[in-house]
Amino acid sequence: MAKAIAKALLEIEAVSLSPNDPFTWSSGIKSPIYCDNRVTLGYPEVRQHIRDGLCDLIETYFGDVEIVSGTATAGIPHAAYVSEKLALPMNYVRSKSKSHGKQNQIEGALSKGKKVVVIEDLISTGGSSITAVEALREAGADVIGVVAIFTYGLKKADEQFKQAQMPLYTLSNYNELIDVAKENGEISDNDIRSLVDWRDNLS
């Protein structure tokens, strides 16, 4: 599964590698990799594969889930696909409360007293996922885990999830992506060293 997802993300250019001409993230970080899983929405077969994989993770590790929750905004469509297949209620969590109306941070199914799994598209530092987890907990939810499409495998993310005592499972990861890119002849051994060094030094 991890290899197939990595291959698909590379093929549709949801993930791009550029060791010699780094991308600039919105945070200002210079990175040899850029991941935009929103691209998957334009590829029905890929998004169905992702949906089925996320469902498998949830059924394997969080079989007693009662609500699926997506992180705004990129996690929302995948949460919708998963909740539809599993026939479960869904909500989504904003990064902060609205400034108008009822000022809700969580929209959709009520979480209080319910076992909830959070769906995220991408794990970088883990900040957005943990923000969603904390908001759901404040609303009285029993958040039992997070599942995501892809992770960079940064130590900061590992530390955040550990501190929050929150299990995390992903469909694919940085190491798998590098392996697939090498098999495809897209990167050299020097590129691999550069990619690994970036991840380890950023951590």
Curated annotation (Swiss-Prot):
InterPro entries for this protein: OPRT, Or_phspho_trans_dom, PRibTrfase_dom, PRTase-like
Its EC number(s): 2.4.2.10
Residue sites binding 5-phospho-alpha-D-ribose 1-diphosphate per the record: 94, 98, 100, 120-128
Binding-site residues, orotate: 124
Keyword Magnesium included in the entry's annotation: yes
HAMAP family hit by this protein: PyrE
Family: Belongs to the purine/pyrimidine phosphoribosyltransferase family. PyrE subfamily.
The protein's name: Orotate phosphoribosyltransferase
Organism of this sequence: Staphylococcus saprophyticus subsp. saprophyticus (strain ATCC 15305 / DSM 20229 / NCIMB 8711 / NCTC 7292 / S-41)
Gene expressing this chain: pyrE
